[in-house]
Amino acid sequence: MSDPTTAEIANEPRLITETGLDRRIADIIEPVLVQMGFRLVRVRMSGQNGLTLQIMTERNDGTMTVEDCEDVSKAVSPVLDVEDPIDKAYHLEVSSPGIDRPMVRKSDFVRWQGHLMKCETSIMVDGRKRFRGKIVSVDEEGFRLERDQPAYGEEAVVAIPFTALSDARLILTDDLIRDALAADKKAKAARAANENFEDEDRDIE
């Protein structure tokens, strides 16, 4: 599976989505995020600090700054106030996915191929529902995971279809930290260069 283009990433649907109230909130805020150039990663209501609405999002290039979090919070707050999906007082928390991020789109698996992850499936796959290992390949239908500790009699590599996924996230390792920081630096440099180019274009006009 080849690396997706910027346009494909911006419009790529999530493999793992919410249910119930979380789903309703996601449906309300996602159009706002898309218009701002962000992608929704996850919505979750929790009882932490009273009632907390956690919105996890990122730019289409995978970056996210503190200022971005503030901008998203300011943009979605009035929309949520109008739609009013939550009938109690709550605290809004906007964050990046983090380095040990949830994997919710096919492009996440392509981007982090070679790294360690853990996942759960909604159906039995090769006799189990929980897996931990390294992503060795990705195609349109799913990915192949090299188990880090296969049980006796288990194949070292298992094929997991995307349609079976119920939860997936990266596992924090030194290699992941190194590659994630390098990717973030590269993406921010590219965005800065593009913004400078657009500024020069406006000056010429």
Curated annotation (Swiss-Prot):
GO terms in the biological process aspect are: ribosomal small subunit assembly; translation
Q: Where are the transmembrane segments?
A: none
Instruction: Write the record's keywords in alphabetical order, separated by commas.
Output: Cytoplasm, Ribosome biogenesis
Q: Which SUPFAM superfamilies match?
A: YhbC-like, C-terminal domain, YhbC-like, N-terminal domain
Q: InterPro entries, from UniProt? A: Ribosome_maturation_RimP (IPR003728), RimP_C (IPR028998), RimP_C_sf (IPR036847), RimP_N (IPR028989), RimP_N_sf (IPR035956)
Q: Does the keyword Cytoplasm apply?
A: yes
The terms describing its cellular component in GO are: cytosol
List the subcellular locations: Cytoplasm
Q: Which domain of life is it from?
A: Bacteria
Q: What is its main location?
A: cytoplasm
The record, for Pfam families, names: DUF150_C (PF17384), RimP_N (PF02576)
Functional note: Required for maturation of 30S ribosomal subunits.
The similarity annotation says:
Belongs to the RimP family.
The name on file for this protein is Ribosome maturation factor RimP
Which organism does this sequence originate in? Answer: Sinorhizobium fredii (strain NBRC 101917 / NGR234)
By which gene is this protein encoded? rimP
